[in-house]
UniProtKB/Swiss-Prot annotation:
Known function: Involved in regulation of actin and microtubule organization. Part of a WAVE complex that activates the Arp2/3 complex.
A GO cellular component annotation in the UniProt record: cytoskeleton
Tissue expression per record: Expressed in seedlings, roots, hypocotyls, cotyledons, leaves, stems, and flowers.
Gene name for this UniProt entry: ABIL1
Source species of the chain: Arabidopsis thaliana
Alphabetical keyword list: Cytoplasm, Cytoskeleton
Protein name per UniProt: Protein ABIL1
Amino acid sequence: METEISGMDNPAMTLDEVSMERNKSFVKALQELKNLRPQLYSAADYCEKSYLHSEQKQMVLDNLKDYTVKALVNAVDHLGTVASKLTDLFDHQNSDISTMEMRASCVSQQLLTCRTYIDKEGLRQQQLLAVIPLHHKHYILPNSVNKRVHFSPLRRTDTRQNHYQAISRLQPSDAPASKSLSWHLGSETKSTLKGTSTVAPSSKDSKAFSKTSGVFHLLGDDENIANKKPLAGSQVSGVPAASTAHKDLEVPKLLTAHRSLDNNPRREIIQAPVRTKSVLSAFFVKQKTPKLKAGYVS
């Protein structure tokens, strides 16, 4: 027992060596209990023979009683030793199992803590990210106005409508707004639709249309010359010249709109008049006048 205790208290021994020592002590106690059985059988045979052949039978009985008591005490002692060794081994096994379970629970708790921290950190980083507006660079407001506009990527409404509303709300009354290409295209389509709904009664309105359509995007000397040449030709030649002048004006309009947005966004752009006449109305008026003259001649 003393060697066993000293071996278990040695700190240089590993966990496997300690468990092996415990197993060896239990096996040794069990072996001693197993060897007690033949000793009791041999003692019983000796007592029986001495009682039959000896003349002092009373003394043999007294010795037999003493030996029986000692053998019983020894057997009980061995049983207690085996039971204590077994209980000790079972307790140490449970302790090892509980230690491993505790380590596993600690590792799982650390993993859960790390996962929770990662989720919170990722959510915080996503919330701190800047919201990028879902618009093209030609449709973004100037820097002075864009600072006060809050774009929401979750709300997917019409881009052109949001652009008009932002300009009408945020542009001050004294400073003119830098209008984008979408605004000019929208105003041009509205003017052409209004022009087709009304029919001109005379050829003077067609000349006024050719003059007013040339006012759109007057930004430089080169563009003024390019706009005036088709107008002069339209006044001389009539209807074909007016249609070709309108076609020639469409390309400079788009080019001037791009140049005004890229090169000088602060330059003021002249708005096209709302009341205009279409090319079709001028064409119909030009063809009605010869018919009327022919009727008068006849």
